[in-house]
């Protein structure tokens, strides 16, 4: 029933494209302070020999592109532009791993089709870390070390401080 709803909403062409992707679910969690971050995503990748219109995608690096496939409806959480930028930033940080996986002359498209999180317990850098974790799981490389600590002095409820320098 859920798949039928998605098919009807996405339309035939989007559903056919989505079937070609290799999908992977991932859950990023961080709990080191008074509150935690939890982000669940489903993202996928597709290798292709050509991309018809690169303007429909965000370029991550040479031959690697991103697109959001999150259906726009009241049932789905939508990411703001800055949240998508942070997600893509995570993919850019580890793009060298994609190039190891990608055959020469091919393109890699990464798509995000579902995301869930509590707007009360999320911080924008969490989207960066979430993208890195998803990629490490989907492409089977070791999760890079992301340092994070909770700074209770940041008003009003504390803030996580992330260090991506070792990524």
Q: For each predicted feature, which ranges?
A:
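Accessory interaction regions appended to the cores of large information-processing enzymes
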Residues: 2-167
